[in-house]
Amino acid sequence: MDKIIKSIAQSGAFRAYVLDSTETVALAQEKHNTLSSSTVALGRTLIANQILAANQKGDSKITVKVIGDSSFGHIISVADTKGHVKGYIQNTGVDIKKTATGEVLVGPFMGNGHFVTIIDYGTGNPYTSTTPLITGEIGEDFAYYLTESEQTPSAIGLNVLLDENDKVKVAGGFMVQVLPGASEEEIARYEKRLQEMPAISHLLASKNHVDALLEAIYGDEPYKRLSEEPLSFQCDCSRERFEAALMTLPKADLQAMIDEDKGAEIVCQFCGTKYQFNENDLEALINDKA
């Protein structure tokens, strides 16, 4: 089962979140049938939103939109504070690797654009923030958002490793943040350790990448595990929700679906689930509108 572990240095100087998001990203790949680059881009966005949601309280919903002007198009993810996330990528078929190394490429195919977050606290006044894409690699763009929008300098690592068949092998990430009150000496030590950390892809390839991430972040510094919480890809779509959407259409449009298509099929963008509405279903909706 996927999980996020929240921890804090014994000194109180900084905190870290580490994530295993392998099943989340694998299920997203399965539902959307994404090719290599699209899988990694979508996966990184889902992991970023899992981190962002873990930072919220109450019943907030967090939407992350990575909007680029190149091959991927846009990536949309929605998460809640209970560990659930869903998402999709506009172009599922991007499959580009470096010839020499086989490394999956993401940044060059995100293009210019924006990292948008919408935090809905359930009060009717969602908070929206937009920052420019810095590299298109998503991790760096997320870190820039945290620094610029939330005024919280953060170190971020996100990645998805694929097997020889381009299926998700492992996915995860981390966030490290300096806390108020940290001394200059503690900040310098933390920055040095982060600079010396192995690449996120190397750490994810470890036998137990969650422990490898924690060890790389803290080194010999004592720390406390504050909590371990489950994560999952879960869509909250339903037939009732799409039926309500159909009810907002004019009667003429519903009648056209009956006359021309003998019904309607609605596909959820976030999970690919198909909902069928036959002629009788649509006629019932028309009668309900009368």
Swiss-Prot record:
Top-level taxon of origin: Bacteria
Q: Does the keyword Disulfide bond apply?
A: yes
User: Coiled-coil segments, which residues?
Assistant: none
Locations listed in the record:
Cytoplasm
> What pairs make up the disulfide bonds?
235-237, 268-271
GO BP terms, alphabetized: protein refolding
The task this protein performs is described as: Redox regulated molecular chaperone. Protects both thermally unfolding and oxidatively damaged proteins from irreversible aggregation. Plays an important role in the bacterial defense system toward oxidative stress.
Q: Which HAMAP family match?
A: HslO (MF_00117)
Entry similarity comment: Belongs to the HSP33 family.
| Name of the protein described by the UniProt record | 33 kDa chaperonin
To which species is this protein native?
Answer: Streptococcus pyogenes serotype M28 (strain MGAS6180)
